């Protein structure tokens, strides 16, 4: 099957899936998950332990073993900044892989954050988009060595471009990078991560334009803020449903908990019903995003998120 034909099928699946999402109650699963093995594997996003990493309590090399020992989670999602510039150091990567393999922990993906011109995949200037795609190649190489299936990138650099223009710029820059990813069998996935990318329809349209099986999304439950200064939000449930047809992972972000152990911003059960409606199978990554003023440390928050996620599946 050609990649283009596959994406036509994905687009049809998107339309059918959204119809299903609209017609099925978001409070009750159409099919009991208790009757079959869960199609999900829980992973942990490294950003959840940013305080431990920034304070020196642990390092990037310690992350896999810490994840297993402290949280009984056996899959990890790295963040580029915690490599501290060692992403091309073969000795460092070898040590990281040795430690993750030794702990029996799966390396899932690397979240790559290059916010300046070096990572501007959506720049209005073609030469900058081209350079940005090449600047991401080292992360594809690192992901491949570590045994990850993907890197996550951002839709950045479009500045004041219009909705349509920014879409075209990013689709072009992303396609350049996806070509390299596909050649190395590493998927390039995009998270809703602010600005236009937090508009589910916009990001889904970008993925359709790229039209490559190695290009997809990483829907994040909590990142649907389209305007940081204005505080504008895209509906997270609609946005997640729009991104799920192209999902190669799911980011279950938590921000705080009430006295019943429920997230204070997102209905996890409703979100996981949406994920299930699209027959997703793969990694669901826990990401502790904050606390909204609640006195909860990272360890307690991650464990609370894991408990809530397991109850919601």
Positions of PLM-derived features:
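Conserved, mostly hydrophobic/aromatic
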Residues: 44, 67, 100, 132, ...
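Structural motif
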Residues: 70-71, 146, 245, 278
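C-terminal segment of N-terminal export signals and the immediately downstream linker at the start
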Residues: 23-53
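C-terminal helical cap(s) of enzyme catalytic domains, especially alpha/beta-barrels
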Residues: 297-313
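Structural motif corresponding to the early beta-alpha repeats
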Residues: 73-175, 182-187, 223, 256-260, ...
